[in-house]
Structure formats: C-alpha cells, structure tokens
C-alpha cells in the first residue's frame, strides 16, 4: 500500500470520531445541524479529493465545487470558510498565463476558499443595506493603508502592470477579503457563536494529527504533493532533539504552533457553548497538540494570551488564582515525573535544545537594524540582496526572516511597521471597550471579548518569532475583523438595552447537565 493511502487511512481514523464529536457537541446547540452536516460532508469530500484526485486541477475543481455548494445553502459564509480552512495543506502552484504573462497568481487551498467563499460573500454583502460600507471604521482605513502601501512600494522593484495587478489581487484575496467578511458577517450573537465554534473546532482537529506526527515521527500530509503531481518545497522532516517537528495541514511547524496557540488563546470564548466536561477534555487535547508542535514562540504567545484573558474583566483575581494553582500543580507533577529533564529542554528561555536558533535570531535583529537604517521610512524592496544580509544565509541557501516585525520594517520601513502595529492597537482598543460595555449586559460576550483580547496580544508576541506566510496572514486579518465585529455587536446590544430601558442581560445558551460526547 502506498504511503498516501496509509496516511489517508490514519487521518480518517482520527478525524471521523472528531467529526462525530462536532455533531454531538455543536449540532443544533451552536450550529444548525443541517448546516453542520453540510460543512462536514464538504470537509470529507475536500480531503478525499486531495488524496485521490491524482491531479491538482481536478482537486481544485472538486474542492471549489464543494465550497460553492455549501456556500449557496449556508447563511454564515465566514463560518463555512473557517470550517474548511485547515482541511488540507496549502499546496501551491501557479495558474498558467498566456502570451507574455508567465502566470496569473499562485493558487492553493487557502486562496481557493477565500475566492469561492469570501469572494461570494463580499459581492453579496455589498448589495445589502444593513452591512456597513467599507470605510465606516478607522480600522478599515488602516487596513487599506497598509495593503495599498505594499502595492505602491512594490513599484520600486517591478513597475510592470502585470506584476502590480497580480500583487493587488493576491493582497485582496489574502488580506482584504478575510478582514472585510470577518468584520461584517456576524449580524447577531448566534452568528458570532457559529463563527467562533467553527474556527476553534477546525483548529482542534489539528491537535490529534500533531500529537500523532510527533509520537510516530511521520508527517501524514507530505504525500499529498506527490499524489497531486507537485513538488512543493515544504522542507519535510525537520528534527528537534530527535523528534520530528509536526506540520499537520499547516505546511510549516512554526505556522502550526501559531495556529494551535491562537486556538488555545481563543478557546475560553466557547466555554458557555458546551458542557464543563467536554470543554475541559477538548481544551486539554488542544493544549496537548500545542505542546507537541515544538514551537517555543507559540508556547510563550499562548501563555500570555491565557494570562491576559484571565486577568481582564470582572473576577480577574479569582481566575488568576485558580490559574496559578493549576499551573503549580502541573509543574509539580512534571518535576516528579521521569520526563522532567526532557520537558525542560524544550521550554523557551531555559531549554537547551537548538540554542543556535537563539543566536541566529539575535544576529538577524542586529543585521536587520543596520539595513533598515539605510532606508528607514519606506524600507527597500531588494533588502535581501544587501551585502549585509548575506551573512545571514543559512545552510539551506536561504535567509530566513524569522521575525515578522523585522520583515515588515525591511520591506516597508517604519511607516509600514507603524501602520501595521496601529491595526493591532486599534483592534485591541475596540475589544477592550467592548469588554467594558458587555460586563453589564452579557457575561458570555465579556468572556468572548477577553479571549479575543488575549489572543491578539499573544499573536503580537508570536509573530516576533516567525515569518508571516502561508495561513498566518489570513488568520491575523480574520482576528482583526472579528475584534471589530465584536465591538460593534456590544455597541448594538448596549444601545438596544438602553433603548428598552430594561436591566436584563443577553440570554446565554443553556448548559447541558447530561454528559455529552467528548
């Protein structure tokens, strides 16, 4: 039996029980069962097409058709997109061009989903009078300024019409569409619950795959590239202290850690949507997946996200006390176990595994600051060709900019970096105001806001340890959009409460007392 069929069997053996769990926990409680079943069928269909189609373009056609089918019948486009976001790796190839145009754009699963689902939703939203037009919020203009600046500065290196159009289309797909739809799609609280639950369950499904790849030293999805006739450069089987660094469907171990850290930070937002038992068991699985990712930057980001979420809003002291006791218990248990030294070796700051990475990052910062100083305002489009950067070239023949802030400053200068950081600050300020508004209206909304705020802070830390590529830009823009939408929902809810003159709270989903599927 070929590797791809063996991998598919193992993936289905882990994923089918997870899909059944989704139906038991979320069906009709958070997500309408008919919509959930449709999304799960599309999920399985896309996975099977990736492994069995034997041709990339046939896989694209089948996947696109399944996405369009689900989208045409579902009322929550962002939830559909998030449900199908991590089905397969972002295996990439070029859409061929014609004449003097060598290719149109690069295409992969992420861009296909953005084009089919979010593109459809964007066109539909533009015709709806109830949807706020683009430009209604300050965050809209900051997002537009950052995306437009990248296009304008790209003119310095390749001022051809074809290249500018290609760059604009790719930024529209990767940045504008996820941000716009995420910031407008949830017109009410049930729709927001649907989006959060869909996103977090999609991330949760990566956890058993990550643990399996770590434990068995077998990357399950690398055979997809060969099955589709592609030679995508995924740098397979990178080892850390004798263990393979998992990829799951993220395409990169650092990106996988980032995704799982986002899930860990955001998971408290769905606390009220499931039983206590199911929430704790699924959260433990998610944390286990994060630990197995071997991404130390993600460890730090997830920890900060949890602390910020716990330390914000009403009852912060109680939450932090419980968190401290739980953390102390875990530390004692690990210290007394025979794996204490091995666990400590993987930890950031105190671990002794791959210490050369720390040295490389320090040198990268020093060299990058010298290069930035030459073009401080708008950076340089050819910074990789600078002689100073050559000393950072690694054995693989690449210069890895493992710090997104440095990468932005090198390419767009302090102007671009300032706009980029401002996007986060404005999004977090809006989330903070939403938390304060919801404190007297809805404990559920307050919890969602705390999770959003903590996760955004964690993201800002993690991107200082990784390049921003593959699914990372999509997730960041989605988080910015969700933060804006959350703020607007709390504003609308507060205004409705004041208008009614009633001190009632927004009703929350009832917690089931009977044991559910775990």
Question: Where are the regions a protein language model picked out?
Answer:
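Alpha-helical transmembrane segments of multi-pass inner-membrane proteins
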Residues: 144-155, 196-312, 433
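Transmembrane alpha-helices of multi-pass inner-membrane enzymes
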Residues: 16-19, 67, 452-512, 516-518
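A membrane-periplasm/extracellular boundary helix in multi-pass inner-membrane enzymes
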Residues: 5, 208, 213-220, 237, ...
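Long extracytoplasmic/lumenal interhelical loops at the membrane interface
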Residues: 340-412, 431-440
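Hydrophobic transmembrane alpha-helices and their immediate junctions
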Residues: 271, 278, 303, 307, ...
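Hydrophobic alpha-helical segments of polytopic membrane proteins
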Residues: 15-16, 20, 29, 34-44, ...
